[in-house]
């Protein structure tokens, strides 16, 4: 690692610790030439993911865009910001584990809905109404039907 003060490439690591909730390593270093101390961060390089939109246009996956959509859907529900962050983290992990370079916006939306379904019906409906472009009350009713318990199961119990 090159020293920012003298550009010497010899340094020693004084301290290493996990940073950014385990997604990076923070290292405190000291230059062996001028004794200047500096901090470096080491992260796993991830493959950028491209989102293919309905219009067939492509854009780079934006964590903040997904996070903002979830925050809007979860407003005034019992879902806190930490849980919303963990949903976005989980979706990013799934995309990386699948080694996907491209994902359709519809697949991404279904991943979000899958995470929301067990958490909050209100947040699910809000997100679905934007993502699925609801045009009227029938779209809401149709989606709400998925939350009704199975009638066969209800009669058995």
UniProtKB/Swiss-Prot annotation:
First and last residues of each zinc finger (unnamed): 3-34
PROSITE patterns per record: ATP_CONE
Comp. bias (Polar residues): 1-11
GO MF annotation terms: ATP binding; DNA binding; zinc ion binding
Region of interest (Disordered), residue spans: 1-21
ATP-cone domain mapped to chain residues: 49-139
UniProt keyword annotation of Cytoplasm present: no
Domain of life: Bacteria
Keywords assigned by UniProt, alphabetized: ATP-binding, DNA-binding, Metal-binding, Nucleotide-binding, Repressor, Transcription, Transcription regulation, Zinc, Zinc-finger
Alphabetical list of InterPro entries matching this protein: ATP-cone_dom, NrdR-like_N, RNR_NrdR-like
Cofactor(s) needed by this chain: Zn(2+)
Family: Belongs to the NrdR family.
Record's function text: Negatively regulates transcription of bacterial ribonucleotide reductase nrd genes and operons by binding to NrdR-boxes.
Name recorded for this polypeptide: Transcriptional repressor NrdR
Provenance organism: Prochlorococcus marinus (strain MIT 9211)
Lineage, opening ranks: Bacteria, Bacillati, Cyanobacteriota, Cyanophyceae, Synechococcales
């Amino acid at each position: 690692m090159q020293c920012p003060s003298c550009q010497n490439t010899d340094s020693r690591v004084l301290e290493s610790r996990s940073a950014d909730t385990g997604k990076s390593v923070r290292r405190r270093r000291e230059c062996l030439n001028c004794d200047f101390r500096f901090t470096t961060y080491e992260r796993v390089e991830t493959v950028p993911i491209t989102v293919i939109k309905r219009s067939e246009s492509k854009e780079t996956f934006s964590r903040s865009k997904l996070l903002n959509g979830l925050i809007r859907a979860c407003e005034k529900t019992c879902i806190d910001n930490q849980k919303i962050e963990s949903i976005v983290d989980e979706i990013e992990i799934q995309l990386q584990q699948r080694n996907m370079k491209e994902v359709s916006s519809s697949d991404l939306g279904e991943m979000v809905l899958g995470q929301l379904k067990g958490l909050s019906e209100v947040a699910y409906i809000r997100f679905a109404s934007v993502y699925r472009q609801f045009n009227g009350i029938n779209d809401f009713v149709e989606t709400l039907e998925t939350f009704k318990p199975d009638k066969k199961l209800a009669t058995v119990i």
